[in-house]
Amino acid sequence: MGTSYEPRRADYLDEMATRHETARVFDVCMSCQKCLNTCSVFPLLVTSIDNCVDRDAALLTPTQQDDIVQLCHQCTQCVSHCPHVDAPAGEAVNFPALVVRHRAMLRKNSFLTLRQQTTEDVLARSATHMSWSQPFRFFGAQLLRYVTDHAPALLLRLHSVQKQDSSRRALTGEVYEVSYFPTCVIDAYAPEVGVATQQVFARVGAQCVRGKEHNCCGAPDLYNGNIKRFRRIVARNVRAFRASIEHGRPIVVGQPGCLHVMREHYATFSDDPSVVDVIAHLQDPWQFLAQVETPAGNTAFQRQPHNSSLVLLQSSTASRRDDTQLRDVLEKCGWDVQVIPHGSVAETVWGLGKERTDEVSGLITEVSGLLEGIGGTEIVSESCLTNLLLTGQLHRQVRHPLEVLAQP
């Protein structure tokens, strides 16, 4: 990731050093502009620097810098476009990592207003609030309405979704255990996806085991600059994952955005000497299913004859992995798959803050436009939050691929 984004550096949270690095990266982006059409961050960056003398990013005011940084919602599209990611140390650019450092600096040096800090903290804890039982869940819902304009879509199904028994006994004779990390997003907003995952795994002889400490990957705290809390979550999760490895259990992470955070940031922010080995053991559901006996030979996975095709929405976050495995699993199960790539809409509820409403709404509209002309074909996406937002926009259900595989 580069020494400039190494949190153990003494000047990592220093305002002058951080703003100097932000200006350097902005200058590189201004001269490059290959990411101009990826999201609204870069048009604002270019417009702001255009108004500076000699187009010098160092002349941006702190407020202008902060406004550009706060607009980023970690979709990671810029990383795949950037020709400077692999440049030598001191010249490399990693915009998402810069945003993490800049936001951490703002929080550490008390540049956030009380309203901003409260809003960020509520968003970071929203999944926890929505996991509460009534009547406390009602209080969590009111907090969510206060901090995001997308609350109606997120809360739409909460009254109809009941706590479901997610324990499923394996349906085959040979049984082995898998450590399943559903993530707080699935727990709070899409528990049916967790149930579907365990139903599908049961069909290949895998019994899902969930540790008591498995809840959140820490992404909301990382993205809002709460590095201290993020480190605690990383330490707890790495400890739990290491125990699973010692018991010989594969580790499956339910959401692509959470898996991305673990692979990209855990080694950087963890002091555990085993963290690199732990990260190497993390899998998404498709890596796991691809490794077991092919499900194509199991009639429980076969498609329904009346609906043989589906559209797979693939976010920019998910596409940074081996993006062929999900498609391969679906095709082995008999589906004809059409992949439509798109910019990541929201991997955590934190990304739905009011200051990012226009950006997220624009992405939802863009993805909806890509789906024009899609008739009765099943539409699936790995991102549970994206599914909720698109379901409200399209007035048709967008499901998780595992829900499709789990259907009888």
Segments and roles (model prediction):
Residues 4, 31-37, 137-138, 207-208:
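Short low-complexity stretches enriched in small and charged residues
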Residues 9-30, 60:
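Asp/Glu-centered strand-loop micro-motifs enriched in Gly/Pro and often flanked by an aromatic residue
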Residues 22-42, 66-88, 92, 188, ...:
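Cysteine-centered iron-sulfur cluster-binding motifs in ferredoxin-type domains/subunits
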Residues 9, 18-19, 52, 62, ...:
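General secondary-structure edge motif
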Residues 1-14, 37-71, 85-114, 399-404:
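Non-heme iron-sulfur electron-transfer modules
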Residues 6-14, 50, 76, 172-175, ...:
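Active-site-adjacent bridging/hinge elements
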